[in-house]
Curated annotation (Swiss-Prot):
This is DNA nucleotidylexotransferase. A 2'-deoxyribonucleoside 5'-triphosphate binds at residues 329-334, 338-341, 449-450. It holds the Pfam family DNA_pol_lambd_f. Can also utilize other divalent cations, such as Mn(2+) and Co(2+) (in vitro). It comes from Ambystoma mexicanum.
Length: 510
């Protein structure tokens, strides 16, 4: 028998959640009144969701900004049926009757047809029934041995805690905009830890013992567990500064400083940017505005493979023995991405230095190049690896926008709202491409660095410095104790010299 205290302890009063997501004020004629679409932001991001909502509305579809009893179709991208169902239940919406839970492919087909299409089996997300029976021997998830370093954790794309990591990434981005580096890193590190877990956080006890989970982070988790949403995240999403900076930085060539300047000038929309005659744009920003819809729509794996072949063909025209590798998120197994990262080298020393300008000139002749900027190499082979975890490397690079010559009917019609006249003429899509040229002896380090993820590389550098008295960047590995550079011909060798278990690229999604 428990002895209850005579003094009554008042429960903690939760902050009322009076902040609601902004309602869309756009007005379009609704042609198809029998369906109401809700687009799930989870794993998609606010900017892309807004773009898709507006695209559907322009085509006469009814799109609900919030989940309600009116919704007939829930559309999701890169989520499993179980993940969507879990999210709906967290929103107390699991009992909405007759709602169709669909993959983005159904939405894509509708946009292409200009009308609702029949739901086929391929469109439906598979839902697993959740057993509510009590287990006599519940399995307690283990948090023992979760390293503070992402390079000691295996992190696949099977993120079981997206409710929390999505919230953390919004907060981290807001802190980045506010230049609060410490809080930004704290939330990104916490998100990275949760992505590596093999179980879903169900209670506060599940985060006990996890590295880097302070009071601020735990408070957000507690809100999400209890209510399925966070007042802090809602505040950020409704903050005018955040929304402006988020929108402006989605434009290719626009950094934080430019975004802040535009916001101070009272600019809030893309239309205001385009119509402001007093603004001066770089050539990259002009291209970013011209091809905004294509670039915001992202790149699919098939498109990345097609672009990679274009790059290989161009490089091999001048140097047949060159090594040309698709890196970045696609090497980590992602099906979509923001751009295409290509790493290029040659076993013949110095030959890679001659390639870039030849490739650029070839693409100009082929009318494939929409825009580009070149950063020449600033490399000094005698320099030690950088101590900074943020500093970019010194390789020769080209940041470009290429035409991907594929029929737009084969590309998701979600990639941009083009009118029928433009669709009739254009058979290409604008895709961002980053080319990086490195010496062959540095290829292993460059491959490791450009594969990512960003948090994985950050923690790899921290681990090398703090635990092994070594320094590593995209160029080299240096042993501070022996005062020597450590030669490595592969990623496996780099992991070995650092005393780390080798982690496959598809497990580096920290």
């Amino acid at each position: 028998m428990y002895a209850f205290p005579t003094t009554r302890i008042a429960p903690r009063r939760k902050q009322p959640k009076c902040i609601k997501p902004p309602k869309c004020t756009s007005k379009y004629d609704i042609k198809f009144k029998d369906i109401a679409i809700y687009i799930l932001e989870r794993k998609m991001g606010a900017s892309r969701r807004y773009f898709l909502m507006e695209l559907a509305r322009k085509k006469g579809f009814r799109v609900e900004p919030d989940l309600s009893e009116y919704v007939t179709h829930v559309v999701s991208e890169k989520n499993s049926g179980a993940e969507v169902l879990e999210w709906l239940q967290a929103k107390k919406a699991g009992s909405i009757p007759n709602v169709a839970i669909l993959d983005i492919s159904w939405f894509t087909d509708c946009m292409g047809a200009g009308q609702p299409v029949e739901i086929e089996r391929k469109h439906r997300l598979t839902l697993q029934k959740i057993c509510v029976c009590k287990s006599p021997s519940p399995v307690v998830p283990s948090r023992v041995g979760v390293s503070q370093y992402a390079c000691q954790r295996k992190t696949t794309l099977d993120n079981k805690n997206t409710l929390f990591t999505d919230a953390f990434e919004i907060l981290a981005e807001n802190y980045e905009f506010r230049e609060n580096e410490r809080s930004c890193l704290s939330f990104r590190q916490a998100a990275s830890v949760l992505k590596s877990l093999t179980f879903t956080i169900a209670g506060m006890a599940d985060v006990d013992g996890l590295p880097g989970f302070g009071d601020h982070i735990r408070a957000v988790i507690e809100d999400l567990i209890e209510d399925g949403e966070s007042s802090k995240v809602s505040e950020v999403l409704n903050d005018e500064v955040y929304r402006s900076l988020k929108l402006f930085t989605t434009i290719f060539g626009v950094g934080l400083r430019t975004a802040e300047k535009w916001h101070r000038l009272g600019i809030r929309t893309l239309e205001e940017i385009k119509s402001n005659e007093n603004l001066k744009f770089s050539k990259m920003q002009i291209a970013g505005l011209q091809h905004y819809e294509d670039i915001l729509g992202g790149v699919r794996k098939a498109e990345a493979d097609a672009v990679a072949m274009v790059v290989r063909d161009a490089v091999w025209t001048f140097l047949p023995d060159a090594v040309v590798t698709l890196t970045g998120g696609f090497r980590r197994g992602n099906k979509t991405g923001h751009d295409v990262d290509m790493l290029i080298t040659s076993p013949i020393q110095g030959k890679e230095k001659e390639l870039l300008h030849k490739v650029i000139n070839l693409w100009k002749k082929q009318d494939l190049l929409l825009c580009h900027t070149i950063h020449e190499s600033t490399m000094d082979e005698d320099n030690l690896p950088s101590k900074s975890v943020n500093l970019l490397d010194h390789f020769q690079k080209c940041f470009a926008i290429l035409k991907s010559n594929q029929h737009r009917g084969e590309i998701s019609s979600c990639d941009g709202p083009h009118d029928s006249r433009e669709r009739g003429k254009r058979i290409w899509k604008a895709i961002r491409v980053d080319l990086v040229f490195c010496p062959f002896e540095q290829y292993a380090f460059a491959l490791l660095g450009w594969t990512g993820s960003r948090q994985f590389e950050r923690d790899l550098r921290r681990y090398a410095s703090h635990e092994k008295k070594m320094m590593i960047d995209n160029h080299a590995l240096y042993d501070k104790t022996k005062r020597v550079f450590v030669k490595c011909e592969s990623e496996e060798e780099i992991f070995g010299h650092l005393g780390l278990e080798y982690i496959d690229p598809v497990e580096r999604n920290a």
